[in-house]
């Protein structure tokens, strides 16, 4: 629940810690949450891509503006790098993107977007083995 998370008294401190975390380095945010922000070009097949990913916040511009970011092959690379049960979220809720994520193997749900923002968002989960 969005409001429950935002109303958490620790939210501002956690938010700041997440954004201040160094790139390409594991940073412990809480005792049960370690964040490693990976800076890499997932659209380039030659790029070494991290594996063992649990969460992807996919914030590319719209498919019309950055079609290479939404192509099947780069999205498949993300899927392949994720752990079973890993979650990808995106503000893009277009049907073509939902169907593409499903065809790659994700289980995709439409969720209500945040207040004063997008009407819907997508949550794509890599199935457990």
Place the predicted regions along the sequence by residue.
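Short alpha-helix
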Residues: 93-104
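A short glycine-rich, Lys/Arg-flanked "PGG" loop and its adjoining helix->strand segment in the class I
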Residues: 68-84
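Conserved beta-strand signature within the Rossmann-like core of class I S-adenosyl-L-methionine
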Residues: 55-57, 84-92
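Core SAM-dependent methyltransferase catalytic element
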Residues: 104-129
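Short glycine-rich, flexible loops that bind phosphorylated cofactors or substrates
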Residues: 64-66
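Short SAM/SAH-binding signature in class I
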Residues: 35, 51-60
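Hydrophobic/aromatic beta-strand patches that form the interior of the parallel beta-sheet core
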Residues: 36-38, 89, 109
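S-adenosyl-L-methionine
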Residues: 1-49
């Amino acid at each position: 629940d969005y409001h429950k998370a935002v109303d958490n008294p620790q939210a501002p401190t956690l938010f700041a810690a997440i954004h201040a975390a160094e790139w390409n380095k594991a940073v412990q945010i809480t005792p049960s949450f370690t964040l490693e922000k990976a800076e890499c070009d997932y659209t380039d097949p030659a790029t070494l891509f991290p594996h063992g990913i649990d969460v992807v916040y996919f914030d590319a511009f719209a498919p019309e503006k950055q079609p290479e970011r939404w192509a099947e092959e780069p999205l498949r690379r993300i899927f392949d790098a994720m752990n079973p049960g890993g979650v990808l979220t995106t503000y893009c809720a277009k049907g073509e993107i939902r169907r593409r994520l499903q065809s790659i193997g994700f289980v995709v749900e439409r969720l209500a977007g945040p207040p004063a923002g997008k009407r819907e968002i997508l949550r794509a989960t890599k199935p457990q083995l």
